[in-house]
Amino acid sequence: MAELKVFYDREGKTLTVWFTDRSQEYVCEETGDEVVLMKDRDGRVIGFEKLNFSVPDSDSLRVALETAPA
């Protein structure tokens, strides 16, 4: 995984995270927990979207990325 893309849509109240090129999206699967998984043709999860996600107007959205040791 070379690049991680995170999109926050305040108006649409969604947080979308892509693990790879979003043009590879083939199908979406709703999990029932207000989370949608985006998958490629091989069924691999390439991203997810959290529905009804919001950050209070007074707060900043900060994203921290940590990697696990090999």
Identify what each model region corresponds to:
Residues 1-70:
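Small, basic N-terminal interaction modules of short regulatory proteins
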